[in-house]
Amino acid sequence: MQVILLDKIGNLGGLGDQVNVKSGYARNFLIPQGKAVMATKDNVAMFETRRAELEAKVAEQLAASEARAESVNTLEGVTIASKAGDEGKLFGSIGTRDIADAITAAGVAVAKSEVRLPEGALRNIGEFEVSIQLHSEVFATAKIAIVAAE
């Protein structure tokens, strides 16, 4: 299925690219999320007239994401308290929701879908650097300290 991308999509293309994707991916994800439109003659003409507006919108989103990344990078002392055993192992784990809530409480709004934990949930006491993807091109790093709750 041919679609016109309205946003940069990883491993697919950038704004204005006409790409061929599976119909289920287009119908269930790209089109409902507003990231693509069907590549009909009318939509191609409509896109060409709105190209400058869409490029300005994408640039504005990128600038806002870079500003958020700067504020995440400057955060000091994001601490999460959790019950732990004597040897530093947590009872349970610290996941993306816990990290997003802690960073949001520290003053920068972060959604749990933006937190990246490639090794999975954190299960030990200590200091960790957590990657946060605020935009397809913008990454930030937050220092998280996990301490034992009293």
Curated annotation (Swiss-Prot):
Return the Gene3D superfamilies for the record: Ribosomal protein L9, C-terminal domain (3.10.430.100), Ribosomal protein L9, N-terminal domain (3.40.5.10)
Q: Which residues cross the membrane?
A: none
What the entry lists under InterPro entries is as follows:
Ribosomal_bL9, Ribosomal_bL9/RNase_H1_N, Ribosomal_bL9_bac/chp, Ribosomal_bL9_C, Ribosomal_bL9_C_sf, Ribosomal_bL9_N, Ribosomal_bL9_N_sf
Cellular component terms (Gene Ontology): ribonucleoprotein complex; ribosome
Locate the coiled-coil region(s) and give their ranges.
Answer: none
Q: Which Pfam families match?
A: Ribosomal_L9_C, Ribosomal_L9_N
Task: List GO BP terms, alphabetically.
Answer: translation
Please tell me whether the keyword Ribonucleoprotein is annotated for this protein: yes
Tell me, in a sentence or two, what this protein's role is. Binds to the 23S rRNA.
Per the record, the similarity remark reads: Belongs to the bacterial ribosomal protein bL9 family.
Matching PANTHER family: 50S RIBOSOMAL PROTEIN L9
Q: What is this protein called?
A: Large ribosomal subunit protein bL9
The record lists the lineage as: Bacteria, Pseudomonadati, Pseudomonadota, Gammaproteobacteria, Vibrionales
